[in-house]
Amino acid sequence: MIVIPRYTIIKEKASSRIPEILDNLNLKNPLVITGKNTKKYNKDFDFIYYDEIETSDLENIKNYANDYDSIMGIGGGRPIDIGKLIAHKSKKPFLSVPTTASNDGIASPIVSLTQPSYMTEAPIAIIADIGIIKKSPKKLLSAGMGDIVSNITAVLDWELGKIEKSEKYSDSSGIFSKTIAIELMDYVLNSNLEEYPKKLVKALIGSGISIAIAHSSRPASGSEHLFSHALDIMKEKYDIDTDSLHGEQCGVGTLAIAQIYFEEKKLDIETFEMIKKSLKAVDAPITAKQLGFDDEIVIEALSSAHALRNRHTILRNGISKTEARKILEKSEII
């Protein structure tokens, strides 16, 4: 069964409608999962800080919900992911109240606390207060663009899985995901960006719904996400001091993977340039240096990314460091 949100509110002062939405859903007593910086947006309900929750104990995490009829995540990625996980384990509805728009986790059924990611259910309601979101750090909103453009290469990888490995593929989900990315890119390249936060939130919610339709992260996560996860491993392995975000890394990864698809004549140069210009338009990183990585680190990440998940992509069985360097140079990432 496909589960998608029953209520999606995307507007200024949307948070004022939380009591109304709860009443419509016949919910009286939610537990709010939030952070210290976003606690101020919760004025009415019991709450717990996300960093006080032990997420490794999956069997007992449901106990946080014992005295409540629902779970509400208020904040960025981690409060929302942890809220989804508690709701899933306790079999209670989840409401997503994002305070920024850096990735499609605000709407998807995926929990990305660990790798591989964890499938739960999509939120029963999404309340996105644009007045709050547009005040969030520009870096977070730029990262959201990186997460959206990655749909282009993710869908290409999914189609490749269907062709080369007879993988199950959903035309409706694939087309929906790709269209969301193209429409947002078209907007940022042909506007003054005044409505960018709202357009971005709509795109991220649409991307999350495409995942719910497919019941798989495939329409929004491919080899570019593997590249991002590889960079996360590099950060820890080499103790690299950079504040690069998931969406930023996915955006740069999308350029690298798009270059490979271009060389295999499966993506045209116009689409590649559209991706690059869209990232630049919102001041998202397009080079390794802008992410905070040396050339050799991103080369190692690209050449090792294929091994991080049993998922067929354009990386197939992996590429050598020599090949990775050529791809990264041609795409001007290094």
Swiss-Prot record:
Known function: Catalyzes the NAD(P)H-dependent reduction of dihydroxyacetonephosphate (DHAP or glycerone phosphate) to glycerol 1-phosphate (G1P). The G1P thus generated is used as the glycerophosphate backbone of phospholipids in the cellular membranes of Archaea.
The biological pathway it contributes to is: Membrane lipid metabolism; glycerophospholipid metabolism
Needed cofactors: Zn(2+)
Q: Name one GO molecular function term.
A: metal ion binding
Reaction catalyzed: sn-glycerol 1-phosphate + NAD(+) = dihydroxyacetone phosphate + NADH + H(+); sn-glycerol 1-phosphate + NADP(+) = dihydroxyacetone phosphate + NADPH + H(+)
* Keyword Oxidoreductase assigned: yes
- Biological processes per GO annotation: glycerophospholipid metabolic process; phospholipid biosynthetic process
Q: What is its main location?
A: cytoplasm
Q: Does the keyword Protein biosynthesis apply?
A: no
Question: Which InterPro entries does the record cross-reference, listed alphabetically?
Answer: G1P_dehydrogenase_arc, G1PDH, Glycerol_DH
| Binding of substrate, residues | D104, D147, H229
Keyword tags: Cytoplasm, Lipid biosynthesis, Lipid metabolism, Metal-binding, NAD, NADP, Oxidoreductase, Phospholipid biosynthesis, Phospholipid metabolism, Zinc
State where the protein is found.
Cytoplasm
Q: Which GO terms describe its cellular component?
A: cytoplasm
Amino acids binding Zn(2+): D147, H225, H246
Q: Where does NAD(+) bind?
A: G77, R78, P79, I80, D81, T99, T100, A101, S102, S108
Q: How is the cofactor bound?
A: Binds 1 zinc ion per subunit.
Write out the similarity annotation: Belongs to the glycerol-1-phosphate dehydrogenase family.
Which protein, by its recorded name, is this?
Answer: Glycerol-1-phosphate dehydrogenase [NAD(P)+]
Cite the PANTHER family for this sequence: GLYCEROL DEHYDROGENASE, GLYCEROL DEHYDROGENASE 1
Tell me which EC number(s) this protein carries. 1.1.1.261
